Amino acid sequence: MDRPDEKIKQHIPQDELLAQLAEECAELSQAALKLRRALTGINPTPVTVEEARKNLVEETADVYNVLGLLLDAVENAEIYDIIRRKKARWVKRLEG
């Protein structure tokens, strides 16, 4: 673990990191919905597609940042295995 991670974990307990993760996930959800509005134009927003996409990236980084503090390397490897399986299942559904 690198120094910034250690310092953060010394000051913020796991339950608070989980609360922060929930907050960041909510913000990511809002960013995704805002980008959808910007892309479709059905429910207009003053935010441009470019601004909305940048915000989505920013909020994604916030989620990754907190997850990096909560999960270890083994769990991260497991996540990528799960992602591969789920994508394969998704493709099968699309192909009927």
Give, region by region, the residue ranges found by the protein language model.
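Flexible "arm" and connector segments at domain edges
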Residues: 1-96
